[in-house]
Amino acid sequence: MKSVYKIPQKIKGLSDERKRKPIPLFNIVMPVLIFLMLQYESFHTIFSAPESMEKRPKNCIRGKIPKVDAVRDLLSRIDPKEIEEIHAQTIDVLKRNRVFREGTIGGYVAAGIDGVELFSSTKKSCPDCLSRKNGTRKTEYFHRSVVGKSPHVIFGQEMLKPRDGSEKDEGELTGAKRLIRHLKKRHGHFADVIMADALYLNAPFINTLKECGLETVIRLKDERRLLFQDAESMFQRDKGRKRSFRKGKKSIEVWDLSGFEIDLTWTIS
């Protein structure tokens, strides 16, 4: 973390907009990063509750222990763009060191993309919150982002944005297209194959991947789709190449098909 990625050095370079700085920025941000990596559930567990003293890894917090309010105050003032740049530089180092060439699938670097909800509340909100009606018809505020990741590394995330008036908030596909274009611009050819669930079987999204020189594997589960019906018909006629194998108690069949009989030009043109 220190010698290769230089994370501690970069944290020390973050802008500190606090007027009073009784505790150095590094002495707050670095422990927060470590505790997030260790998946502690609450800042209170670390910085407030007396019983948490024994839970703190030795030498993780040095000097004066910050109160949880001081932690929140500092984190709310840090520019997210600076954090994003540290993350992007870390991805650059991983690419340069050819880390992503380990654990490929047939030599292809595969990355998944999906939406994730980060926060929800009926009481607290900010200008960037999305909104919806919950089961009791109360307005619920939440944050949601699209995340692109390899099995162990997050390439990037894109927050979905609220819209004014009666328009619906941004959808996952809109954020996904923006994320793909951003990663392509920032990191070049960051992956070979993008894997996604059935939501992403969408012409504009697939076209975005094609424009960025990416292949895709998308789950197809709607039996009503013509593409599904066409593929099933070809399976029954033993078209294409077939491979069978077992995984635990499950028997899995993999088919490699091309030359579908329906006109797909409207789908991926």
Regions found by a protein language model. Name each.
Residues 133-190:
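Electropositive, glycine- and tryptophan-enriched low-complexity nucleic-acid-binding patches
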Residues 31, 46, 67, 71, ...:
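Short, conserved catalytic/metal-binding motifs centered on acidic residues
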Residues 1-66, 72:
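Gly/serine-rich nucleotide phosphate-binding loop at the start of the catalytic core
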